[in-house]
Structure formats: structure tokens, C-alpha cells
């Protein structure tokens, strides 16, 4: 993911993120996961944040119309503040993923992630409305709220942004 915004020629937002989560089912509704995330946000107070986590997930609802999963796990986080200070900490990770199929060609997604460490709590909420355009292309309207509980003085703890994007599904 890459997000940038400019107002009157001045950059007001610049964030990049990449991640991967692998799942291994061991019953119809239970699974183990391994996840890794990298985030770089110029205006968050953190130069970069990387996390690795393993844990357990449970599908509470899994029907043709909707799905709800919750996850919990443990891991590690490596962060670099904008002043160059490095922070390494263990984390507890929790997540929620909800999907509502509105029609054959549209759906609503709500994802929530929290990573609690000794030094910082990171949380992210992502609400998205996805509409199929043609073939594997879809239009996605999303609203994201990101929060770091411990940031340098003068930096906002919470960042919000709205995005309109085109998504290609495999």
C-alpha cells in the first residue's frame, strides 16, 4: 500500500505498508496464522515499524452472506522513531475480520488490528466497500484509522484517511 497527499504543493501524508499472513486450518473453524508487517509513515512519529506474529484464529460466522473471524497471538516488533531511537519489544496481537456480501458484485469489509507492546500500542481500523467493475477489477472505497499510543511530542497519535482505489483480484 502506498498513500500520499499534497496540499498547496506541500506533502501532508506519505505512508507505505506491506504485509503477509499465512493460515493453516486444523479444524473447519480454527486455524493457526503467521503474519509479518512492515509500515513506514512519514508523519506518524515512527520512521518504520516491523512486526512478526504467530497465533490462533477462529471463524465465528462463516456463511454465504457474511463471515466473522477473530485472532489472537504473540510476536515481536522492531520500531525506529523519527529521532533515530530503536525500540524492540514483544507484542500481543489481536484482530477481527468481518465481511458482508451485499450482492453478487459488492461487499463490505471491516478489519481491526491491535498490537500491544511495552512501549507502544498500535491499532488500525479499515472499513471498505468493494464493487466489482469487470472481470477481476473492483472499485474500493475505504476509510482507515491508525493510532500509535506513544509518539514524540508534537506528533498526532491518530491518522485518518479516505481512499478510492482500483483492485485486481487473483
What are these regions, as identified by a protein language model?
Residues 6-14, 40-48, 82-88, 115-124, ...:
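Solvent-exposed loop/turn segments connecting transmembrane beta-strands
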Residues 29-32, 64-68, 102-108, 131-141:
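Repeated loop/turn-to-beta-strand initiation elements of outer-membrane beta-barrel proteins
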Residues 18-20, 54, 94-96, 127, ...:
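Membrane-embedded beta-strands of outer-membrane beta-barrel proteins
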Residues 53, 59, 63-115:
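Detector for outer-membrane/organellar transmembrane beta-barrel domains
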Residues 53, 129-132, 158-170:
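Outer-membrane beta-barrel "beta-signal"
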Residues 1-7, 36-42, 58-60, 74-80, ...:
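Transmembrane beta-strands of outer-membrane beta-barrel pores
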Residues 1, 34-36, 70-72, 94, ...:
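Membrane-embedded beta-strand positions of outer-membrane beta-barrel proteins
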Residues 21-28, 57-62, 78-80, 100-104, ...:
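Outer-membrane beta-barrel proteins
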Amino acid at each position: 500500500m502506498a498513500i500520499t497527499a499534497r496540499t498547496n504543493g506541500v506533502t501532508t501524508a506519505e505512508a507505505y505498508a506491506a504485509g503477509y499472513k499465512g493460515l493453516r486450518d486444523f479444524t473447519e473453524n480454527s486455524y493457526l496464522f503467521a503474519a509479518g508487517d512492515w509500515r513506514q509513515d512519514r508523519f506518524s512519529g515512527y520512521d518504520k515499524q516491523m512486526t512478526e506474529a504467530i497465533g490462533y484464529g477462529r471463524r465465528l460466522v462463516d456463511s454465504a452472506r457474511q463471515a466473522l473471524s477473530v485472532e489472537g497471538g504473540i510476536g515481536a516488533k522492531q520500531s525506529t522513531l523519527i529521532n533515530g531511537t530503536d525500540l524492540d519489544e514483544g507484542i500481543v496481537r489481536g484482530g477481527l475480520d468481518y465481511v458482508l456480501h451485499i450482492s453478487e458484485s459488492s461487499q463490505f469489509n471491516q478489519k481491526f488490528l491491535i498490537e500491544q507492546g511495552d512501549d507502544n500500542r498500535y491499532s488500525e481500523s479499515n472499513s471498505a466497500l468493494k464493487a466489482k467493475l469487470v472481470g477481476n477489477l473492483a472499485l474500493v472505497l475505504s476509510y482507515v484509522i491508525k493510532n500509535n499510543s506513544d509518539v514524540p511530542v508534537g506528533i498526532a497519535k491518530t491518522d485518518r484517511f479516505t481512499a478510492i482505489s482500483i483492485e485486481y483480484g487473483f
